[in-house]
From Swiss-Prot:
PROSITE patterns: AA_TRNA_LIGASE_I. Pfam families: Anticodon_2, tRNA-synt_1c. One of its GO terms (molecular function) is ATP binding. PANTHER family: GLUTAMATE--TRNA LIGASE, GLUTAMATE--TRNA LIGASE, MITOCHONDRIAL-RELATED. A motif ('HIGH' region) lies at residues 10-20. Gene3D superfamilies: 1.10.10.350, HUPs. This is Glutamate--tRNA ligase. The lineage of its organism: Bacteria, Pseudomonadati, Pseudomonadota, Gammaproteobacteria, Enterobacterales. Zn(2+) binds at C99, C101, C126, D128. It comes from Photorhabdus laumondii subsp. laumondii (strain DSM 15139 / CIP 105565 / TT01) (Photorhabdus luminescens subsp. laumondii). Keywords: Aminoacyl-tRNA synthetase, ATP-binding, Cytoplasm, Ligase, Metal-binding, Nucleotide-binding, Protein biosynthesis, Zinc. Belongs to the class-I aminoacyl-tRNA synthetase family. Glutamate--tRNA ligase type 1 subfamily.
Amino acid sequence: MSKIKTRFAPSPTGYLHVGGARTALYSWLYSRHNKGEFVLRIEDTDLERSTQEAINAIMDGMNWLNLNWDEGPYYQTKRFDRYNQAIDQMLEQGNAYRCYCSKEHLEALRETQMANGEKPRYDGRCRDNPCQHDPAQPHVVRFRNPQEGSVIFNDQIRGPIEFSNQELDDLIIRRTDGSPTYNFCVVIDDWDMEITHVIRGEDHINNTPRQINILKALGAPVPEYAHVSMILGDDGKKLSKRHGAVSVMQYRDDGYLPEALLNYLVRLGWSHGDQEIFSIEEMTELFSLDAINKSASAFNTEKLQWLNHHYINTLPPEKVAVHLAWHIEQQGIDSRNGPQLVDLIKLLGERCKTLKEMAESCRYFYEDFAEFDADAAKKHLRPVARQPLEVVHAKLASITDWTPENVHHAIQSTADELEVGMGKVGMPLRVAATGAGQSPGVDVTIHAIGQPRTLSRINQALEFIAQRETQS
């Protein structure tokens, strides 16, 4: 058996969305599972809509997901000479012909067919027309599609699919301006690049019989095809921006880990028993096309958040820290003056579903604040809190070995000494140290904030209470 070779071939007319990312992942996994090769091809024949910005977005998304490619990126716009050479060869062999039909004729034909309830298709007027035309006249080139028989292919996901050749008209393969069309470029690329398995969305099923017929006319091998179902929103409608169908890089910006998004995407159609959590190594080992479901999958943001929370708390903190550093930088926080990011992840991981949420909630570890949260201060920085804060300040100041255990002992001994519950000490201390009413355990939080900064903030809270007393 020849080496398995797959490809991901996006059109750079927009960002890399989740559907495209899933297709890329499935193609990548199939090649990696079979120790084959994965090709990246940019199908940029739509010159009006293709942009460099979109190409960059595709590359950024692939790199962020760590879907590396063995060949490419190939660009179709750089291969026009090759496509036109193949078209000229087909003209010589009689597998293609020049069509001189005017736009007006084709539009009138279409209107007549639709009025008669027929499927619009080219009527073959120039297919066997003996009339001679000057090749310099404006014309397109059409593929001479077989008029009898059927195209049958065994879809690796859906099983046998059959199209009657009578349903397929003669496809334009070169436009009037001399540029080759999408369906023809795809065929030549898959042939030249020795693609063995084409894994793509179900919206390409109708292109497949046309492409197979062109491949056969060229004497080229026909690859295996696998068409994955679309992704729906949780309301059963086609996924769109209102469902959260944004670019892959938007998920990065929103604080998702690539491992979480990959795990989520692989399960949108593929399964292995009841298993939900898959490392990339497990995906590679277990992946197969016959385990992909034919039916559409529904996108569920809550499930993605659950997976992201799982990976935040189970991946090596050093790995998560690399991604968290970017989010903290986006918040304008200098993380050099505070706890190590690996320690921050251990502190906040259980409380945060995304890295963005973590970055937004960690500022007090690295920067002083000008004021306390109004509700938290009103509730906990009252005159009754002055004595607990003064006593715990003294005990914290006397610590020579700043550990979570010693911090906890200082808080506990303050409560014991004043004969009050831990909350009477811990809550005012939390608000004093963090500026807010919620945080991880007050002892580990204060330990991470550090001794000098904690003592300074307690003094700030005592001043706040004193001002409050004078105003009352």
